[in-house]
Amino acid sequence: MKKITWIILLLLAAIILAACQANYIHDVQGGTVSPSSSAELTGLATQ
């Protein structure tokens, strides 16, 4: 059971990192900075 939970945690971390990277690329290309749900999840919006 522990191996399954580790796989799920790794998948969640990868999804959050990918979403933040996509938002960062979008912000750089568009020039607009808007707080997104993924940024709030990782705590970037509060900084």
Swiss-Prot record:
N-terminal signal peptide: 1-19
Superkingdom classification of source: Bacteria
Entry annotated with the keyword Cell division: no
Protein location: Cell outer membrane
Lipid-substituted positions (N-palmitoyl cysteine): C20
Keywords: Cell outer membrane, Lipoprotein, Membrane, Palmitate, Plasmid, Signal
Membrane topology field: Lipid-anchor
Record bears the keyword Acyltransferase: no
Task performed by this protein: Lysis proteins are required for both colicin release and partial cell lysis.
Name of the protein: Lysis protein for colicin E5
An individual GO BP term: cytolysis
GO terms for cellular component: cell outer membrane
InterPro entries: Lysis_col
Lipidation (S-diacylglycerol cysteine): C20
